[in-house]
Amino acid sequence: MYTSVVRLQNVFGFFTTVAFVVAAFIAASDFLTERAPIVRTLKTTSVQVVRGRPHYYSSKKEEYAVINFSLDADLSSLFTWNTKQVFVYVTAEWPAADHAKTNATNEAVIWDTIITSPSADHLANIGPVAMKKLRKSAGGKSIDPNRGKLSLKNQRHKYKITHPSGKLAMTDNVTLRLHYNVQPWVGLLTWDQDVDYGYWKALKNGVSKRFKLPAIKEKKPASAGAR
Amino acid sequence: MAEQLLDQVRDVAEGQIDFEGQKLVELLVNVTLALTGVVSFLVGYILQDIKLALQIGLAGTALTFILVVPPWPFYNRNPVKWLQVGGGLVPPQSLIVDEKSFR
Amino acid sequence: MLSGLANPRQAAVQLMNFGLILSTAFMMWKGISVITDSPSPIVVVLSGSMEPAFQRGDLLFLWNRNVLAETSVGEIVVYNVKGKDIPIVHRIVRKFGKGPEAKLLTKGDNNVSDDTELYASGQDYLVRNDIIGSVFAYIPFVGYVTILLSEHPWLKTVMLGLMGLVVVLQRE
């Protein structure tokens, strides 16, 4: 019997199918959009090593590297209709103690930021004033690739970095590296890549010059809140 | 009395439609939902606006529900002409016939 | 329903069909588990600590094999902490060393501090074995039903009531 309940079930069933197919197409449309992110500059502006404690009640003293940097990058091609946010992060990378034998490295994030697409602005975790400003910055557009243009001069680190051994001073061959993670509205999560895949080009010039961490600066840091 | 009332409620809740109506419903569901999907993807992709795509999709789906679920009169334009009661043979009671084809 | 009781063969067929559906779902889940090498290859986001990337109710697909490269900094992983039931979805922000012994530190994008507090007491870092998968694909919202049902148990009653109503109003 073809009753209202049966029709309701059938329509809902076909709706889920259609929704799934459309979502698959949206996810696939990512692969047809060119991505050509480039980094123009990524360099350190000040590097220090200070002594500190992991948290206030700890008696353990550790060495912390405090790295500030400048960054000029154009990630605007990552913003399409299916981009929810781009998570941009800068890591410091240095060879581990047994690097010669195992090729092992250490890597730690020193700074990150979330760039939302205008379609996801309402989800951003910011105050009402900043939210208003953010929404205004999109100017009513549904996508805003200009947000992917980063120009940071002498950017303060967000995280002081440390090592489980507590020793970091005089570490050599440290590099900074820019990474990104594109979060879609539906589909695959993608990260920066070293080689080209189809329309997606590798991130160019995303590594800084090698540098060496200095000796410990004998001054008590204002806050040892590196965590 | 209560049985009659329940029967009336059942009639309303059931929302039966005739065979021609069922055919029409099937066609309408397939066409409207598929069209909604295509339009929402194309408009969203061309205007690069995923919110608009979502709105079109949901609006089209809501429209389909409203169009198809209630037993609108135009689904009942071809009522089945049953044979007269007591006119022919009485089928044996123990016969089990597939529900759908029987009704 | 009543016809099923009158005819044992039909009842048996219905029972078999029901069993078939259940076992198919179970086998698919386990099959995906084997392919992804993850005990729980699809998870629903339960907290807002990764906002705005993931909201509560979003569906995440996990991959737990290191085919081309090791699990590294920047990946969003789901991990278990000893003594806690609920797996956590956070991003790796530090990695020291290489291989199964590498020390990993995680942090939620929306959290101010890293996860040291969330780990078991005395545990400062995760190792690869604590991780049950890295997020590789995402579908928004569809898992929200499970959150609704677990947080508002009265909804289950409402659903049962609705089903009962449908049965009452349907003619046999």
UniProtKB/Swiss-Prot annotation, chain C:
Residues 158-169 are annotated as: C-terminal short (CTS) helix. CDD domains: S26_SPase_I. Residues 1-14 are cytoplasmic. The chain crosses the membrane at residues 15-35. GO terms for biological process: protein targeting to ER; signal peptide processing. Glycans are attached at residue 111. The keyword Membrane applies. It is an enzyme of class 3 (hydrolase). Keywords: Endoplasmic reticulum, Glycoprotein, Hydrolase, Membrane, Protease, Signal-anchor, Transmembrane, Transmembrane helix. SUPFAM superfamilies: LexA/Signal peptidase. GO terms for cellular component: signal peptidase complex. It is a single-pass type II membrane protein. Its EC number is 3.4.21.89. It catalyses: Cleavage of hydrophobic, N-terminal signal or leader sequences from secreted and periplasmic proteins. Gene3D superfamilies: Umud Fragment, subunit A (2.10.109.10). One of its GO terms (molecular function) is peptidase activity. Residues 36-172 are lumenal. It is found in: Endoplasmic reticulum membrane. It comes from the Eukaryota. Component of the signal peptidase complex (SPC) composed of a catalytic subunit SEC11 and three accessory subunits SPC1, SPC2 and SPC3. The complex induces a local thinning of the ER membrane which is used to measure the length of the signal peptide (SP) h-region of protein substrates. This ensures the selectivity of the complex towards h-regions shorter than 18-20 amino acids. SPC associates with the translocon complex. Catalytic component of the signal peptidase complex (SPC) which catalyzes the cleavage of N-terminal signal sequences from nascent proteins as they are translocated into the lumen of the endoplasmic reticulum. Specifically cleaves N-terminal signal peptides that contain a hydrophobic alpha-helix (h-region) shorter than 18-20 amino acids. Belongs to the peptidase S26B family. The C-terminal short (CTS) helix is essential for catalytic activity. It may be accommodated as a transmembrane helix in the thinned membrane environment of the complex, similarly to the signal peptide in the complex substrates. This is Signal peptidase complex catalytic subunit sec11.
